[in-house]
Amino acid sequence: MDHGAPSTPAKHHVGVHSSDEGFLAVMVPFLREGIAAEDEPDPAAVTTSRKLDLLRDALGPDARHVDFLDSARWYRGTPANSMATALDYYVAHASPEGRLHLAGEPVWPGRSPRQISEWKRYEALATELFTGAPPDLMCLYDTRTAPPDVIDAARHTHPTELHRHGIRPSPLYTEPAVYATQDLGPLPAPPRDAIGIGLDGDLTAGHRFAADQAQARGMAPDAAARFGRAVSGATGYAASQGCDRAYLKLWSTRERVICELRTPRGRITDPFLGFRPPGPGTRPEDGLWDTRQVCEFVDMRSGDEAKEGWTIRMETALVPAG
C-alpha cells in the first residue's frame, strides 16, 4: 500500500441499497467481475448469513468461486480490530500483484453513538490505507438497518458509489485526513479524583503504573497487563518524538478504565496514527497499533500554534477478575 500517492484514491466503493433486490443488483455484478478477472483469486463477500444465502442462490454455479464470510465475526470488536482482520485477509488472499475483489457490510445495530462515530472514521481510514493499492473494495449500506447519518457519512468516506447502472464518483467525497479530523472537539477534563504521575526521562515507566492502577480497580491481572502494554505504546511514541517529559492520569468508572497521556510540547499531525500495521521495518508509531488493538477508544488531540503539546486518551472495558 502506497502512502505516497494521496492523489490516487483507492478503489473503495459504497453500495447503498434499500431492498434485497437492490443488494443483489450491486453485489452480483461486483462478485462476477472478480470471478472473471484474470489472475485474481476468488472474491470475498462479508455480510449477514441471510444475505449470504441470497447471494448463493443468485450466483448459482458461480457461488463456488466466492468466499462467503459472516459479518458478525468480521466486524466484531473495535474498528482497529476489524482493520486488522481486513488487512490479514488481504495479505493472505490477494494475488501477488495485490488484486482482490472484497465486499463487506459493516454491522450497525447495537452500536452506541460513540461507537458509530468511530466506525464512520474507520471507513475514511480504509480509503487512506488502500490508496495506491490495486484491490477493489465495496462497502454495503442497507437503509433498512443503517441510520441515515451513517448513510450520509458513507458518501463522504467513499470516492465512488456502485449502483445497478455502474460506478459513479461520489459528489460528497471528502479527503480521508479531513473527514477523520472534522468535528473533533476538546476532550472532557479528567475527573478530580484521577491519579496522576509525571514521567521524566524513562517514559516507559507508565506501563507499570497503568497496569497496577487498572488491577487495583478490579481488572483481571492479564487484562491489566494488556492495558499496561497498550499505554506503553503511547509513551513509547512520545519518547520517539523526543519528549523527555510527559504526564499520565488514570481514572475509572464501574465499567471502564481510562488513561491519558499528555506531553507539554510537540504536535500530532497524522490522524491515522496506530491504524497502519507494523511493517518489515520499525517505525516510531508501531506501538500504537497494539494500543488500538487493545483499547476500545483511543482519542488523540493536538495543540495549535498558540499552544503546543498533545494528548492520547486510552479507554477500555474494566474486565473484572474471576
Place the predicted regions along the sequence by residue:
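Positively charged, polar, low-complexity stretches
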Residues: M1-P188
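Short amphipathic
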Residues: V16, P190-L199
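Amphipathic coiled-coil/heptad-repeat helices and related helical stalk/stem segments
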Residues: M27, Y122, V231, P284-G287
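Conserved beta-strand-loop-beta-strand hairpin that lines the nucleotide-binding pocket
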Residues: G185, G236-G322
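The cytosolic transmitter module of two-component sensor histidine kinases
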Residues: L199, L203, F227, P284-G287
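Conserved short strand/loop->alpha-helix "switch" segment adjacent to the catalytic nucleotide/phosphoryl-transfer site
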Residues: T204-T235, A239
